[in-house]
C-alpha cells in the first residue's frame, strides 16, 4: 500500500541497521526518502537499491554529521530543494558508547560524545526540519530512544542518560508542535539483533568472562517472548507511527522489546 505516496521523509542513520530498514519501508510505502549518514558510499548504494526496487518514487543520499549544525542545515536545504518540502523525520542515528563501565570509570570525553551524537544529533534535525513541517500544515517526527531510557541501566551511564534525554525531547516537541498538527513520538527498542548487538555481546562476554552464547541467553531470558527484537520489528513500528493511521498518537514511547518491560 502506498500510504505515504507524495510524502517526503528524512531518515538519519540510514546507511545501515535500523535506519536502513526504515528507509526501505518508507520507500515501500511510497515516500520519497532522504537518506542521511556519514558513510556516503553505503548511503549511495542503498539509495540506488531503493530507486531500483521502488521506481515510482525517488531517493536522495546526503552525507552529513548530525552533530554539525551547518551540515544539518545544508542537508535540510538540499532535501527541500530536491523535493519541494518535507513531511516526515525519523531520527535513528546514534552510538552505544562504552559498555560494562562503572560511572567512576566512564570518561568525560566519552560521555560527551555519546550525548552529542544521541541527543544533539536528534535535536538538530528536528530544529531544521520543523519549519518545513509547519509549512506543510503537519507532519511526523519519530525518534529512537530505547528501553535503557525507560529504566536505570547500570554500567551504561552515557547511553542510558542520552536515551532519557531523547524521551524528554520527544515529549516537549509533542506539546510544542501539536497545534501545528505535527505528531512526535519515540520508539524504545530492547537489544536488537544485528551488527551492533553482536559487538556489544562480544565485549560484554570478554569483560565478564562468559561465552557469547551465555550472554545472548541472558538477554533473551529477560523478555516475555524469549527472543531478540529484530531491526524489521522496529522499522514496522516506525512505519506505523508516520502513517495516517497514527494521526492521533503523539508524545508517547512505543516499546519494541519482546516483552522486556512487562
Language model segments and positions:
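Conserved glycine-rich cofactor-binding loop
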Residues: 8, 15-17
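Residue(s) in the substrate-gating loop at a strand-loop-helix junction
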Residues: 146
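Conserved glycine-rich Rossmann-like NAD(P)H-binding loop of the short-chain dehydrogenase/reductase
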Residues: 29-46
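C-terminal substrate-recognition "lid" of short-chain dehydrogenase/reductases
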Residues: 3, 123, 134, 138, ...
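Active-site helix of classical SDR
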Residues: 126, 162, 170
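Short, small/polar-rich loop/turn modules that mediate ligand/substrate recognition or access, typified
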Residues: 178, 183, 249-251
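Substrate-binding pocket helix/loop in short-chain dehydrogenase/reductase
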Residues: 99-103, 107-112, 141, 219
